[in-house]
């Protein structure tokens, strides 16, 4: 459910407009022609003027009490929807639903300026040598340093710091409290609140007199359509750039070390840590709390299960899991074997390691 205080009430949509936006087909043409949809919700919570979706059989039981005005679902479940509810059919109900939600609530797609309008707010600090194109918004307390460049339509939210020489493309958003240094940022990039981009990497040369700090003279490059979650950190490179490829989405609380190169359209979930000089191919997916050691390569399209520990190269297109990570089938066999062994020992009365008195 949306809250009008946070997201303005959208312009109502007819069923025909919803069908056009989503690519879905009206299953009952002529029914509910007068319906106007003004919001979205879950199958359990959506009201008579709201849209919901159904794409899994586990939620079929909810249909009996559903009050939604319309539901997007697959051909498989369309006949299960009560007659009082309008039905739109799509081969990908969730994607169709998201397309409509984006139209209704465009403000939810990126952080919004505090004052809600374009321009330089009172209390913003912009160096005289910084260059801002027309249509840039800078919130109170934000700092834009010497020689920095910000493209048209971009938003610098409250208390963000854009360091000297940083270049930000067009229609990008730098969230509240972000620090951004030694970085090149593309178009339509979103960096959420509190992220840290471009600080020096963790590099020290051990010696008998202590640890000698290694200068980090590279940059961070965020290509077009990258999104970085709140509280995530991306270190600049030591000698080469740290690069986040086009369309890659990074969740909250992710650590990316110096010299890491991440390909296009990757998904990196919360609490993942990627050590220095590691390379990810395109469309790689890392589950939550994955750890990746340094100087290894993960191939295009590979998927790593949550809480796994990657200690070496991973081939393209595979699914790995465990610690150390290995092919999923092998990991499952090991887990099954251990479970059976523990059950066998329990039946025989033998003590399990760690339980001896």
UniProtKB/Swiss-Prot annotation:
NCBIfam families: lipid_A_lpxD, PRK00892.1. GO terms for cellular component: membrane. This is UDP-3-O-acylglucosamine N-acyltransferase. It comes from Azorhizobium caulinodans (strain ATCC 43989 / DSM 5975 / JCM 20966 / LMG 6465 / NBRC 14845 / NCIMB 13405 / ORS 571). Keywords: Acyltransferase, Lipid A biosynthesis, Lipid biosynthesis, Lipid metabolism, Repeat, Transferase. CDD domains: LbH_LpxD (cd03352). Its EC number is 2.3.1.191. The active site is at 258 (proton acceptor). Pathway: Bacterial outer membrane biogenesis; LPS lipid A biosynthesis. It holds the Pfam family Hexapep. HAMAP family: LpxD. SUPFAM superfamilies: Trimeric LpxA-like enzymes. Belongs to the transferase hexapeptide repeat family. LpxD subfamily. Homotrimer. One of its GO terms (biological process) is lipid A biosynthetic process. The lineage of its organism: Bacteria, Pseudomonadati, Pseudomonadota, Alphaproteobacteria, Hyphomicrobiales. Gene3D superfamilies: Hexapeptide repeat proteins (2.160.10.10), MurE/MurF, N-terminal domain (3.40.1390.10). It catalyses: a UDP-3-O-[(3R)-3-hydroxyacyl]-alpha-D-glucosamine + a (3R)-hydroxyacyl-[ACP] = a UDP-2-N,3-O-bis[(3R)-3-hydroxyacyl]-alpha-D-glucosamine + holo-[ACP] + H(+). Catalyzes the N-acylation of UDP-3-O-acylglucosamine using 3-hydroxyacyl-ACP as the acyl donor. Is involved in the biosynthesis of lipid A, a phosphorylated glycolipid that anchors the lipopolysaccharide to the outer membrane of the cell. GO terms for molecular function: N-acyltransferase activity. It is an enzyme of class 2 (transferase). InterPro entries: Hexapep, Hexapep_transf_CS, LpxD, Trimer_LpxA-like_sf, UDP_GlcNAc_AcTrfase_non-rep.
């Amino acid at each position: 459910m949306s809250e009008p205080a946070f997201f303005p009430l959208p312009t109502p949509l007819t069923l025909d407009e919803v069908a056009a936006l989503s690519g879905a087909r009206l299953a009952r043409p002529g029914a509910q022609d007068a319906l106007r949809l003004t919001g979205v919700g879950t199958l359990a919570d959506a009201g008579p003027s709201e849209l919901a979706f159904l794409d899994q059989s586990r939620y079929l039981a909810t249909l009996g009490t559903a009050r939604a005005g319309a539901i997007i679902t697959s051909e498989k479940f369309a006949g299960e929807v009560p007659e009082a509810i309008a039905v739109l059919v799509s081969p990908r109900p969730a994607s169709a639903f998201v397309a409509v939600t984006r139209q209704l609530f465009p403000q939810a797609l990126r952080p919004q300026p505090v004052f809600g309008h374009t321009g330089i707010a009172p209390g913003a600090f912009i160096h005289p040598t910084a260059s801002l194109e027309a249509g840039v918004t800078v919130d109170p307390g934000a700092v834009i340093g010497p020689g920095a460049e910000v493209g048209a339509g971009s938003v610098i939210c409250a208390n963000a710091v854009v360091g000297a020489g940083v270049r930000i493309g067009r229609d990008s958003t730098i969230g509240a409290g972000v620090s951004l240094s030694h970085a090149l940022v593309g178009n339509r990039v979103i960096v959420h609140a509190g992220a840290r981009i471009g600080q020096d990497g963790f590099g020290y040369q051990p010696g008998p007199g202590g640890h000698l700090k290694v200068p980090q003279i590279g940059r961070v490059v965020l290509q077009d359509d990258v999104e970085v979650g709140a509280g995530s950190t991306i270190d600049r490179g030591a000698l080469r750039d740290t690069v986040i490829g086009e369309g890659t989405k990074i969740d909250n609380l992710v650590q990316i070390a110096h010299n890491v190169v991440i390909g296009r359209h990757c998904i990196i979930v919360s609490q993942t840590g990627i050590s220095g000089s590691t390379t990810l191919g395109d469309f790689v997916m890392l589950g939550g709390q994955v750890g990746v050691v340094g100087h290894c390569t993960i191939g295009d399209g590979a998927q790593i299960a949550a809480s796994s520990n990657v200690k070496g190269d991973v081939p393209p297109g595979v699914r790995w899991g465990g610690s150390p990570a290995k092919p999923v089938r092998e990991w499952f066999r090991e887990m099954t074997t251990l479970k059976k062994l523990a059950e066998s020992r329990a039946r025989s009365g033998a003590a399990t390691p760690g339980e001896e008195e």
